[in-house]
Amino acid sequence: MERTTTFAGDPNIGVFARVAGNIAVIPPEAPEEFRNAIREGLGVELLVTTIQGSAIIGSLVAGNSRGLVVSGLATDEELAVLKKHRKVMLLCETMNAAGNVIMANDTFAAVHPDLPAEVAEEIGAFLGVEVIHLTLGGVRTTGMAGVATNKGVIVHPRATAQEIARLETVSGIPVGTGTINMGSGLVGTGLLVNDTGYLAGNATSGFELGRVEDVFGFLE
């Protein structure tokens, strides 16, 4: 099975889609090749919509098997598509690009260090997870500096031992460093993964793919 793809030639596939368990949210302009790759690689149902009229779904949506946290600027029509499959929480802060500022699985969420504590608590209660404020190697947009499933977490290669230890404590699963698309530490921009499988941007090297497989347990 092919493990790399593009979004209309762009290897930053994580910017244009959000995978949450058995669903993937993608924009209407997603090419058929991209749709097929996600279906086959991740075994997900596709929810097709823009968010606040934009195709950058990965930056504007975060979530897990219980719910989706979405930019507060999403329209009622867009939210209706999501609500058929998940409960939805609107992030109405200045920092409303949910996919950029939240990394989550079914156990934990790591959020931007400047996200207000009360909002972080609300996200935790909504997703049913423990929440920590975190940077990863100096990067504050945790949703792009890391990717989590229920089996593993991959983070920016500059993440410190202390940051990794905090993630291991809150998640209880393996945490490893890696890159995507020939050296990008912003792994969330080029990686879509769930407990079933993964897809990476087509600029990703064989070594980088091997690291993804190792961290998420696909080599077992």
UniProtKB/Swiss-Prot annotation:
It holds the Pfam family eIF-6. Keywords: Initiation factor, Protein biosynthesis. One of its GO terms (molecular function) is ribosome binding. InterPro entries: eIF6. It comes from the Archaea. One of its GO terms (biological process) is cytosolic ribosome assembly. SUPFAM superfamilies: Pentein (SSF55909). This is Translation initiation factor 6. Binds to the 50S ribosomal subunit and prevents its association with the 30S ribosomal subunit to form the 70S initiation complex. It comes from Methanoregula boonei (strain DSM 21154 / JCM 14090 / 6A8). Belongs to the eIF-6 family.
